Design a protein with these regions (language model features):
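Ferredoxin-like iron-sulfur electron-transfer modules
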Residues: 154-155, 200-223
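Broad hydrophobic/π-residue packing in well-ordered secondary structure
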Residues: 75, 143, 186, 209-212, ...
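Active-site cofactor/cluster-binding pocket
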Residues: 1-175
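Beta-sheet entry/capping signal
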Residues: 12, 35, 213, 228-230
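Conserved oxyanion/phosphate-binding beta-strand-loop segments in alpha/beta enzyme cores
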Residues: 178-198
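Iron-sulfur cluster-binding cysteine motifs and their immediate structural context
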Residues: 201-202, 226-233
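Long amphipathic N-terminal alpha/beta scaffold segment
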Residues: 156, 166, 190-192, 200-201
Length: 233
């Protein structure tokens, strides 16, 4: 165990496509020649659109093997609902070469039977189908040569609100939200040395990580406010 994240990995997987859109620094943790797997519903054109230039350059210049898998739709198809974990675990074993693929699939199916047999063979079969789907639905992406020189215009989102709150969001919350908090200098926290943060910052914490979003129907809403209580952002 280590107190720090691994930053020279043979295999890194992004299980939520919103992290690609937000440009989280994930692929940079893959060592040259390693594997990067993205769980998404995109074809190559959409992937090319959503991947940021710095990620493209790193992939191309470091010979990173790029794969995608649509575990989101596969989970629904095999009856697992929104549970993609079993599919993605099978995809990991199919790519990472920790165990021979067939052997890993057998072990996973044995574990699924042991864990879910009390819930019935139907549940076990769904997990077996998820394992087979994850091991066989990988898409290898041929990395274009021009990714090595990919560029894009810098985009700075306009934020409205109290000046001090916007400054805190821009200088601290956004880097931390992009998993770049370790890069912040001590000087960034001078105005917050006593631990006090500006109020109203939750309004800027739009993570956007859900694949599906419920639609509010005013005609049937009972105004219980439980939706806002459960998800204040």
């Amino acid at each position: 165990k280590s107190p720090y994240y691994i930053n020279k990995a043979d295999f890194v997987a992004c299980h939520n496509p919103s992290y690609i859109v937000k440009n989280f620094p994930m692929v940079q943790d893959v060592k040259p020649g390693g594997i990067f797997l993205i769980n998404c519903q995109w074809d190559f054109e959409e992937l090319n659109k959503h991947l940021h230039a710095d990620a493209k350059r790193y992939i191309a210049k470091n010979n990173v093997q790029l794969y995608t898998i649509n575990a989101i739709d596969l989970a629904v198809k095999v009856g697992m609902g929104k549970r993609t974990n079993t599919i993605l675990q099978a995809a990991f074993f199919a790519l990472a070469n920790v165990l021979p693929k067939d052997e890993a699939v057998k072990y996973m199916k044995d574990a699924a039977e042991h864990s879910y047999m009390k819930k019935g063979m139907d549940v076990v079969q769904k997990n077996w189908d998820a394992i087979d789907a994850g091991a066989g639905a990988l898409v290898k992406i041929d990395v274009p040569a021009d990714w090595a020189n990919a560029t894009e215009e810098a985009h700075v989102e306009h934020l409205e609100g109290p000046e001090k709150t916007v400054a805190m969001v821009r200088n601290i919350m956004e880097p931390v939200g992009r998993m770049n908090g370790d890069s912040l200098p001590v000087s960034a926290f001078v105005d917050y040395a006593d631990g006090t943060f500006q109020q109203g910052a939750a309004a800027y914490e739009k993570r956007g990580v859900s694949v599906t979003v419920p639609e509010w129907t005013s005609e049937t809403c009972a105004q219980c406010n439980q939706c806002a209580y459960v998800c204040p952002h």
